[in-house]
A protein has these predicted regions:
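Phosphate-recognition beta-domain surfaces
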Residues: 1-116
Length: 116
């Protein structure tokens, strides 16, 4: 799961969101629900990657990438560690889904809508 304060979509580019985070309510390794920290690196703003032919993609190394038409292929993947930290003692590429590449049955992305 992810929580962002910016709208997803548009041309191919990275977007920085200083308040974003990934979180896990349930996972294959039975770690209790937690929020995954965003590693802030000077000069790198890689919270979210947008591309017209991609699904939601988070982190500079595509830490969590949901492919286009994700329920019909195994191109979605997780590779934590570039922007978002895996919990101590957990393998970065399998923590969220139990395997590096996966076919999601459901995807939820949340963002905050504010009224001016």
């Amino acid at each position: 799961f992810c929580f962002v304060f910016r709208h997803l979509g548009g041309s191919a580019r990275y977007i920085d969101d200083p308040d974003d985070f990934l979180f896990s309510l349930a996972n294959k390794v039975n770690v209790k629900p937690l929020k995954l920290a965003h590693r802030r690196i000077a000069g790198r703003s890689h919270s979210i990657y947008t591309h017209y032919n991609y699904g939601p993609t988070f982190g500079g190394g595509h830490d969590l990438h949901i492919s286009n038409h994700a329920n019909s292929n195994s191109h979605s993947h997780t590779h934590l560690g570039h922007t978002y930290k895996a919990p101590p003692g957990q393998q970065a590429n399998i923590f969220l889904a139990g395997t590096h590449h996966f076919v999601p049955s459901e995807v939820e992305a949340f963002y905050l809508v504010t009224k001016n």
